[in-house]
A protein has these predicted regions:
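C-terminal regulatory/interaction regions
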Residues: 270-273, 279-289
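Charged helix-capping and loop-helix junction motifs
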Residues: 189-197, 226-235, 261-262
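Conserved, mostly hydrophobic/aromatic
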Residues: 21, 40, 110, 173, ...
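His/Asp/Glu-enriched short active-site or ligand-binding loop at hydrolase and phosphoryl-transfer sites
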Residues: 211-222
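Hydrophobic residues within beta-strands of alpha/beta enzymes
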Residues: 48-50, 110, 171, 212, ...
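Structural recognition of alpha->loop->beta junctions
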Residues: 106-109, 233, 237-244, 261-277
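An N-terminally biased module of ancient metal coordination in phosphate/nucleic-acid-related enzymes
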Residues: 3-97, 178-193, 241, 245, ...
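Extended substrate/RNA-proximal surfaces in nucleic-acid metabolism proteins
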Residues: 62, 67-207
Length: 289
């Protein structure tokens, strides 16, 4: 086994591939698409995508407004032309399963995600799984009588719906509901019910060829020290010969490549030898550095 110094040196030489999960001021990001693309270029990437959150049929604080789609796509076309020959630029959408599927049409690629738990007739009352430890504690108590396995079954049942949408090539943050578990353990990932729900969704998604993103967003936000999915889930993905890609779920220029070296090392430790990168038309394998 490599020592700590050897591991650091190894991480330093890991080759950058691309980041397809990044948000801008067109939804809940802090920077313009051009600022994000320039940050990806400075990080050594030869291609990158900016993704806009799909609008939702109820009020919330982070999804894009429907009228933002056209100006976003116009700006992305401008950036594709401006940076041609320097970095390939792609326009993506992070599509929530509660959004209209028609929103998938004009984009180069789509990330399919679940953020909400459907717990009642009022969609605006549906809790978000990644808001805060306090809201997680509240929705578990209020809607699931403290039964975290029931909440996990609800969440993975939602995420499984991504399998039914062929235009969503990537599965976003597979186990997003565990975002806060390093601070306060809300979910028992070793529970038979939790694993059954997670693996049922995983099998459905793998069976239709979805690519699973290994997402470092909670690392940059200070909630986790490792990416989604958890290691046990990554090992299960490897057993199923699933395809994976790495993304930062970045909302600002300083996190576009957060923990990519660490994540590639983790994937190698789980037996992965390649990640899948988008080339503008399809996804192709790239050997992990």
């Amino acid at each position: 086994m490599a020592g700590a110094d050897e591991l650091v040196q190894e991480l330093d030489v890991v080759l950058m591939v691309q980041n397809l999960h990044a948000h801008s001021v067109f939804c809940d990001g802090k920077n313009t698409p051009e600022e994000m693309i320039r940050a990806c270029l400075a990080a050594g990437m030869d291609s990158a995508g900016i993704s806009i959150h799909s609008p939702l049929p109820f009020a919330n604080g982070w999804a894009a407004k429907a009228e933002n789609a056209a100006p976003f796509l116009h700006e992305m076309r401008r950036l594709k032309a401006k940076y041609a020959g320097q970095i390939a630029v792609y326009a993506g959408v992070e599509w929530d399963v509660l959004s209209d599927a028609g929103w998938l049409e004009p984009f180069d690629y789509a990330i399919g995600s679940a953020h909400f738990l459907p717990v009642g007739d009022d969609p605006e009352a549906n809790p978000t799984v990644d808001d805060s430890p306090e809201t997680t504690r509240c929705f578990l108590a209020e809607h699931f009588d403290g039964d975290s396995d029931a909440a996990a079954e609800c969440y993975f049942g939602q995420l499984k719906r991504v399998a039914d949408e062929p235009r969503a090539q990537i599965v976003g943050h597979f186990d997003l509901l565990t975002k806060f578990d390093e601070r306060e353990r809300f979910f028992d990932e070793a529970s038979p019910r939790y694993r059954a729900a997670a693996l049922d969704a995983m099998d459905a998604l793998v069976s239709v060829g979805k690519i699973f993103e290994v997402n470092t967003g909670a690392i940059s936000r200070g909630w986790r020290t490792a990416p989604y999915p958890s290691r046990w889930a990554l090992e299960q993905l490897k057993r199923r010969s699933a395809r994976v890609t790495i993304s930062s779920d970045s909302h600002s220029t300083d996190t576009v490549d957060c923990a990519f070296g660490q994540t590639q090392a983790l994937l190698r430790a789980c037996g992965f030898e390649e990640i899948w990168a988008f080339d503008g038309e399809t996804f192709r394998p790239k050997k992990i550095g």
